[in-house]
Curated annotation (Swiss-Prot):
HAMAP family: IPP_trans. GO terms for biological process: tRNA modification. Catalyzes the transfer of a dimethylallyl group onto the adenine at position 37 in tRNAs that read codons beginning with uridine, leading to the formation of N6-(dimethylallyl)adenosine (i(6)A). This is tRNA dimethylallyltransferase. Its EC number is 2.5.1.75. PANTHER family: TRNA DIMETHYLALLYLTRANSFERASE (PTHR11088:SF60). The keyword ATP-binding applies.
């Protein structure tokens, strides 16, 4: 690898072969894997997330697995903070950070940074709400046009919640919401080699998704979800339970879907997720594409990383 302080990222839709490639690379490079997956963070959710096995985790150190209970939340800002700290720690120990996953919101937070918007202030919000009742929404929207015309143009005049929030941000920060949104913080500044793994033909990805879903159902996945279903503190609106596969099995256990309906909807939802992932990847700069199943994939990655990261990322 040419750039010694570089980070490697392997993107890809679900069931594309990211895990296999990452483990193969770890045999050649002294890597530690940082999971970039919003479902793998949860304890007790192993089968439906295709979590790396204990054997795989023993072969290569994995990070950001099993760090939250399913009742808890984990934001893109949480990931950004944790990933940056892990990257520094891994490199300080002389190893290579390898980011692997398909949660594109997390990747975006890490690579582009996040906007730091002020938290809601009760006193400011109460004052603005009182003005809303006294002067009306049109007056507040007119005020927003003066201090933040871009937000005023974007926000519908009949949307009180967003108008109040935009004015609240301006009063707290002294800057318009538009300006604060453009200001990004916490982005990765180290060189990065980015690879995306996906089949050339969509039907191949669909076949792999269906095979993975059926493999999941052949394991005690129903029992895994039943354990979650039995917990009184969990409900279907939590991010953990909304995860693809878990949502549909939860509905099956609740009597809302038959087994066949659960399977069909789970496969469709996984395909839709993969489509969103592919759409994001096609628009992301600096990504080098690899075809799922290419026997020379690992060698192509190693060859590509002989270039300086700056040159690597300048190519389409």
């Amino acid at each position: 690898m040419h750039s010694k302080d570089a980070v490697i990222a392997i993107y890809g839709p679900t069931a594309s072969g990211k895990t296999a490639l990452s483990l193969a690379l770890c045999e050649q490079l002294d890597c530690e894997i940082i999971s970039v997956d919003s479902a793998l963070i949860y304890r007790g959710m192993d089968i439906g997330t295709a979590k790396p096995s204990a054997e795989e985790q023993n072969l290569v150190p994995h990070h950001l697995l099993d760090i939250r209970d399913p009742a808890e939340t984990y934001s893109a800002a949480d990931f950004q903070k944790d990933a940056l700290a892990l990257i520094d720690d891994i490199q300080q120990r002389g190893k290579v950070p390898l980011l692997v996953g398909g949660t594109m919101l997390y990747f975006k937070a890490l690579l582009e940074g996040l906007s730091h918007l002020p938290e809601s202030d009760t006193s400011v919000r109460e004052k603005l709400t009182a003005e809303l009742h006294e002067k009306g929404l049109a007056e507040l929207h007119s005020r927003l046009q003066k201090v933040d015309p871009t937000s005023a143009k974007r926000i519908h005049p009949n949307d009180p919640q967003r108008i109040l929030r935009a004015l609240e941000v301006y009063e707290i920060a002294g800057k318009p919401l538009t300006e604060l949104t453009r200001e990004r913080h916490g982005q990765l500044t180290k060189p990065i080699y980015q690879f995306a793994v996906a089949p050339v033909e969509r039907k191949v990805l669909h076949q792999r998704i269906e095979q993975r879903f059926d493999h999941m159902l052949a394991q005690p996945f129903k029992e895994e979800v039943a354990t979650l279903f039995a917990r009184p503190d969990l409900h279907p609106d939590l991010p953990s339970i909304r995860s693809v596969g878990y949502r549909q099995m939860w509905q099956h256990l609740a009597g809302e879907l038959s087994y066949d309906e659960m399977r069909e909807r789970g496969i469709i939802a996984t395909r839709q997720l993969a489509k969103r992932q592919m759409t994001w990847l096609r628009g992301w700069p600096g990504v080098h594409w690899l075809e799922t199943g290419d026997l020379n994939m690992q060698a192509k990655v190693m060859t590509a990383m002989q270039q300086p990261a700056k040159i690597f990322n300048s190519k389409d």
